[in-house]
């Protein structure tokens, strides 16, 4: 890898400033480039970004590792859906091969004791390829573009009782762009997701649907990001429709390695199915979200 490639790899990660990245526009580098999301992939909370995870190693092209693999990064999440009495923990790890191919893994444990299932185990394996670099072709407006997929497996008595599928595969395309011409830098990211998930895979998998997702983040200070995230609810057959997901989040880039995140998420009516037998706009309630992210 030559110096230009290494600089390009860094600049792409820096461009994720407002979604928990380093901020070239303000001349200060902080951790989280991007986050490991709940499923382990490089993104924010629910959604992926077009930027790949993991920083280059020190030493530039003189370090042979930069021709092979990035540094790893890790993220841990705690989701407290208090109104539904659901506790949700997640841990993810990711790195990038050849400055372009991201590989990720994630594990999630959901305790939904109120609904009779204290141990919902979710396993995720992901890959993402950055097809187009941000500001490619010597422009200032071309977004980074990536495609990716995540294999998901859910081990749960609830899945078995509802006769849904335990595993499935999500595919997505996403574009992300940092806008620096505004008074405060703004990151815009949007994509399409082909998924069979039922309640974010907490309840398993069914038929496939194509839905949209998006993020917007603003950086009012060099070490603080404030943003919103949205994921459209998928219609996955048999009358099942997931509720749209929303969250508002604040991230503090503590230093080059550590990022702390707090958020509030709304996933939809937690009791719709149990009260009315309706499978439309299914969700698992709302609550607070906290995350610790570490990047070597």
Go through each PLM region and give its residues.
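Solvent-exposed loop segments that connect transmembrane elements
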Residues: 271-283
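Generic helix N-cap/helix-start motif at coil->alpha-helix transitions
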Residues: 85, 241-242
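Short, well-ordered secondary-structure micro-motifs
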Residues: 157-159, 200-204, 238-240, 273
């Amino acid at each position: 890898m030559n110096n230009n490639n290494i600089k390009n790899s860094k600049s792409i990660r820096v461009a994720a400033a407002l979604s928990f990245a380093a901020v070239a526009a303000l001349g200060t580098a902080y951790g989280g480039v991007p986050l490991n999301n709940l499923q382990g992939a490089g993104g924010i909370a629910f959604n992926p970004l077009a930027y790949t995870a993991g920083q280059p190693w020190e030493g530039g092209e003189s370090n042979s590792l930069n021709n092979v693999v990035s540094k790893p990064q890790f993220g841990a999440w705690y989701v407290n859906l208090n109104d539904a009495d659901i506790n949700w923990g997640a841990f993810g790890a990711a790195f990038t091969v050849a400055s372009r191919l991201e590989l990720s893994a994630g594990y999630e444990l959901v305790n939904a004791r109120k609904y009779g299932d204290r141990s919902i185990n979710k396993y995720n394996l992901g890959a993402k390829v950055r097809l187009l670099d941000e500001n490619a072709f010597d422009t200032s407006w071309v977004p980074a573009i990536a495609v990716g997929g995540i294999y998901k497996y859910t081990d749960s008595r609830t899945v078995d009782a509802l006769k849904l599928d335990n595993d499935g595969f999500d595919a997505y395309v996403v574009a992300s762009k940092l806008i620096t011409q505004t008074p405060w830098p703004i990151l815009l990211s949007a994509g399409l997701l082909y998924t069979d998930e039922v309640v974010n895979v907490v309840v398993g998998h069914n038929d496939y649907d194509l839905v949209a997702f998006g993020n917007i983040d603003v950086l009012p200070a060099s070490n603080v990001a404030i943003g919103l995230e949205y994921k459209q609810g998928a219609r996955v057959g048999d009358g099942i429709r997931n509720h749209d997901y929303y969250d508002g989040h604040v991230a503090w880039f503590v230093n080059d390695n550590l990022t702390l995140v707090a958020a509030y998420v709304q996933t939809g009516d937690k009791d719709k199915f149990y009260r009315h037998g309706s499978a439309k706009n299914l969700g698992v309630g709302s609550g607070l979200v906290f995350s610790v992210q570490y990047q070597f």
